[in-house]
Amino acid sequence: KIWLEILPSQIGKPFFFSYNVPRSIGERGLYGSQMGSSKLVEFQKVGNQVQLIAKNTQFFAKEGTPQAQFVSESFSDSLMSSTAMVSQPHPETKSILIEANSLLFTDIPGYQTRLEASFRMPFALDTRNTSFTSTKNTSALTGLEVKAHFAVSKLSAPPMTSSIVPATPPPSATPDPRSMFVSFYYSLMPLPEPMQTRLADERVGFFTVARTDFTTDAKIKSKTHYLERWRLEKKDPSAAISEPKEPIVYWLDKNIPEQYRATVTAGVLEWNKAFEKAGFKNALVVKQQQVTDDFNNMDARHASIRWFTGADVGFAIGPRRSDPRTGEILDADIGMSDGFTRSARRILVDDLARPRGPDGEMCEEAETSAQELHYALDLLEARGLELDGPEADALAKAYLKRTIMHEVGHTIGLRHNFRASTLNDLKKIHDAEFTKVNGMSSSIMDYLPFNIAPKGEKQGEYVMSTIGAYDYWAVEFGYKQFPLGQEEIGLNQILAKSSQRELQYDTDEDAGYGSVIGIDPNVNRFDMGSDPLAYYKLRMKLSRELWDRLQNMNLATGESYERLTRSFRSGFAQVANAAPLAAKYIGGVYTRRERAGSSRPLFEPVDAAKQRDALALITK
């Protein structure tokens, strides 16, 4: 058993509480090396019980006012867990002991619901076979890793008769589908002094924390959105460019294959270009965790990059956790599937799990990105690329760097920008000297396809190798420091540039989700060039080239047709992806994020000739 000592000064004191998932079962969205959620919590003593309470930080009013009283009466906190005291107060310190086992051997993460959603089976936490695997306690952090056992007593018998509704299969990646272990790393640490907040603006894409202030009814809008961002302060506030007092440190986990560590490091440090323009030199630092290091990268004190894998996985994700009072980012952990760097033949295009996340909270490149990689390598292999040769290795590392840059962007607070890919025309994106400096797109935060030129034409970079103009601008808006009393003026000067083409922004809600597509044909995932319709035509042309080459491919005697079938399907997937995006032109509307006083309209219908061109493409 493990006991926690709680001092009287720690009762009613706010703490940052989070959980991460170091180990899971490796299928259907349940993977290891994933971040969980976080809360602002307090320990509260009720009789002999000590409760772990998640405080409601969404709604507040100034302490001591009548408004603060009615807010506390109107909205509830939440009980995360509770346990009985196991000691009398210490005679000198007055501290008490509680049993960590009974406090944390509960389903605080709500993983039973996730298991039920994935398998439609009533898995329950088995506390008798749940245990602690590691603990860490310092003045800055208390960390405990729980190896939780989830089980179900029996599997459902198959139906006696066939059904038009297919049954959800049980787990297939565990030796026995009735039993599985999942690890949770719980972190509890003191909150920092509140950081100075910065108000969000809809013209720049940052993740935000929202708080509703009921102190006064004079405001039309009581809800305020603060940027999620790291605390960066200059060592020399008077210098135009200064190193920060505390840089943002990314720890490379010791589970990253050695041949990819330099590429991952390069992807992280690429963002220092933007931070230097915003006034910070060496804002981002990369450190390698050694085998002898005794800390866990899954704790809340270390921003990290980790590898993971699974039976059906091929995605990367870059979430972050912030102080709900101010938006200060306190932790971030990038999870990188080895499917991004392994051979394209390893990627399971047919049945990839789809990470879920409302309003762009999670990076959802999984299925389409894997299809895109498979398609690109199919076509390049058909043109003569050797998948086990140096050119393919360089391509895989370039793709890895691009992915790391994208995910690091999320961990510094940036949302997707799905308008960014329309900045340059199709000719410009094959000018390698230009794109190495400026990027193919105005932002790495777009979902960008492989840049493949038509047969016989000039080939530029296959993937984006640096950050774009929008990325520099967004970092400047989020992180630039100003002299006392000058912040509002300085931020407005930055925002005044938002109408410039290379700085325009639209995100997940604008591009649409699932079967619901947006109204602006220039805001899409996986398009490229200033004329998306021309790009869709190019992709269809490339698919026809792939099919023609596959027609003449000779398989070795005894070789399976599966490889050929999958390659044909990757070409058809391009057509399937292009058709609904081309349909956005028909009845489509170009949108703009403008403020009152602008001469540019907020909405502009797509030209009729362009609509007819799109219709002709779809109906061919």
Segment roles from a protein language model:
Residues 262-269, 273, 398, 402, ...:
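Solvent-exposed, polar/charged alpha-helical surfaces in well-ordered, non-transmembrane soluble domains
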Residues 269-280, 310, 410, 414, ...:
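Sec-exported extracytoplasmic/periplasmic mature domains
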Residues 288-308, 398-454:
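The catalytic-center signature of Zn2+-dependent metalloproteases
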Residues 328-347, 358-365, 404, 409, ...:
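Extended catalytic-interface subdomain
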Residues 390-391, 395, 420-620:
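Conserved catalytic/binding loops enriched for acidic/polar residues
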Residues 1-256, 274, 278, 283, ...:
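Auxiliary tRNA-acceptor-end handling modules of aminoacyl-tRNA synthetases
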Residues 86, 237, 278, 312, ...:
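Short secondary-structure junctions and interdomain/linker hinges
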Residues 258-260:
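Short, charged/polar "capping" segments at the starts of alpha-helices
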